[in-house]
Amino acid sequence: MNTSRSIVEVGVAMVLKDRFSQEAGKISGSFRTMMNDMNTWNRGIQMSASNTMDFGMQLVGGMARAYKYSAGVQNEVWTASKIAGATIAEQREMLQLAKDVNEITPLTASDVASGQRYLAMAGNKFDAIKEMIGPASKLASIFTMPVGQKGGVADLMTNIMSMYQIPMTEAARVTDDLYTAVTNANISLTDLAQSISYAGADMATAGVDLRQTAAAIGVLGDMGIQGSMAGTSLANMIRYLQLSLVNQKKKGYNALADLGLSPDEFFDAQGNLIDLYTIYQKFAKAAVDLPSRIETPTFFNIFGVRGNRGMLPVLRDIASGRDKMGKILATYDQNIGAVNRLNEERLKTDAGVIDQFESSIENLTVT
């Protein structure tokens, strides 16, 4: 209060002196400058205090978010380890694995940990999870999909491998095969997995492997027959074919004879069905120049309505010379190691370098 009064008194004195001095204008200007400087200084103190408070709140908030994120990652790993029956040492290794995978992919440690949980939920133990999470995460990064959560790559991949009883040690090869099938046809990984969920049981029972099944799904996908529709078509096709071959479907058995096909040529020496691509080729050859008046009832009697959708589109594709199934089958071996190679190439790009930097910062919060 005294300070404010002394300032006012000085101001009044200056104004009074202005009336009797030739320097009156300068003095009034000096006073205004002094007051402006003092106001600026006062606002600066207030802003500094406010900024300090804001910074402190942001710092505390950031620490809270980091702690919450770290706790979330550790909880995912803890849950996965309990489901998988892992030891304490294996649980720690799973946490470190989530951080390691985070550093070589654009995925978050939280997403990777979620992927581990879904692998565990599918019945995989620690060793299998360790084999699968890296390849699954790399495939997820290529397809810009999550590796965790329901419908993520880990979930889809373990379902497919379980359907065909593929050892988890072959996870890297499976990701290469899935990458090849998806990138050579008009389907997504989700489409492919859904088709396999409908067709896989019948295909696997008939001895048709993942590569051939995925290649056939790719051909149908190019023609708009995708997802469950493709899977249902292929399941009916292979099922009715086998029934026709052993004369349990009498009209189908007779239709095979009308095409000049013998049931014996569809089985190997051990009595197992020959490979799917060769089956398609045999029917494609038999159907050449066959008039629709004969083709329609003949193939209906063998494969039924839905089964025809899994046979005729592929035959037309082969007859056209496009032969997408043959091309996909030939590409599988060429693409061995493709997922790992593409992931390494991406890490060398500007986006990859940024991702690695962000991952390193993220890993600091996961302790």
Question: What residue spans do the PLM features occupy?
Answer:
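Amphipathic/coiled-coil alpha-helical interface segments used
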Residues: 17-20, 34-53, 102, 161, ...
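SIR2/sirtuin NAD+-dependent deacylase catalytic core
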Residues: 125
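N-terminal pre-first-transmembrane soluble regions of secretory-pathway and organelle membrane proteins
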Residues: 146-148
